[in-house]
């Protein structure tokens, strides 16, 4: 009987320790224009960010809504320019172990129209990525990339965003 009780206690102890060691979630928010807050861009983030820790990436309308609620609780309607303390405070409120804040600066559009040919769009995008924990802004990474498209500036913008995130992900995946 003692062996059974001891084995049950050991199994219970092992199971509770593994639940505490579960993977943490990493939230990702995009701070920038509305054109960057669509499913296409959320998919790019999920494709590019692959944490070595095995953490689950939370990105999309749910995380963006949490960010909006954060500002609403502070008395603002809509996005505000965050300070360092705001990023830390949002990370605490988000329920995630870490939050990656992707600040997308205004993209520059350069159009070339050759005689008799289609217009060619070139878009430049700069992304500042802040890795935030509940106690500090742990690190920052910056990338600026451009992309060309003969068909649409939306495609060029997506391509530039993907290139920037690919550059940032090479460094950021080790830390999240």
Regions found by a protein language model. Name each.
Residues 96-114:
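Charged, amphipathic alpha-helical segments
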Residues 88, 114-119:
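Short, P/G- and charge-enriched loop/turn segments at secondary-structure junctions
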Residues 21-27, 36, 40-41, 93-94, ...:
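C-terminal/domain-edge helix-coil "capping" segments
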Residues 29-31:
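Short hydrophobic segments within beta-strands
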Residues 7-16:
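Bacterial N-terminal signal peptides
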């Amino acid at each position: 009987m003692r062996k059974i009780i001891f084995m049950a206690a050991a199994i219970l102890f092992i199971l509770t320790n593994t639940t505490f060691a579960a993977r943490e979630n990493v939230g990702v928010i995009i701070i920038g224009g509305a054109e960057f807050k669509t499913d296409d861009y959320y998919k790019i983030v999920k494709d590019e960010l692959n944490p070595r820790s095995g953490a689950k990436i939370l990105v999309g309308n749910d995380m963006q809504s949490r960010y909006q609620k954060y500002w609403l609780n502070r008395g603002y309607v809509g996005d505000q320019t965050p300070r360092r303390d705001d990023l830390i405070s949002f990370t605490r409120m988000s329920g995630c172990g870490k939050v990656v804040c992707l600040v997308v600066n205004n993209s520059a559009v350069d159009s070339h129209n050759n005689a008799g040919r289609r217009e060619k769009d070139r878009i430049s995008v700069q992304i500042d990525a802040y890795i935030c924990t509940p106690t500090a802004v742990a690190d920052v990474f910056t990338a600026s990339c451009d992309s060309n498209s003969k068909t649409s500036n939306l495609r060029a913008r997506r391509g530039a965003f993907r290139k920037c995130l690919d550059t940032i992900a090479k460094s950021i995946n080790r830390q999240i």
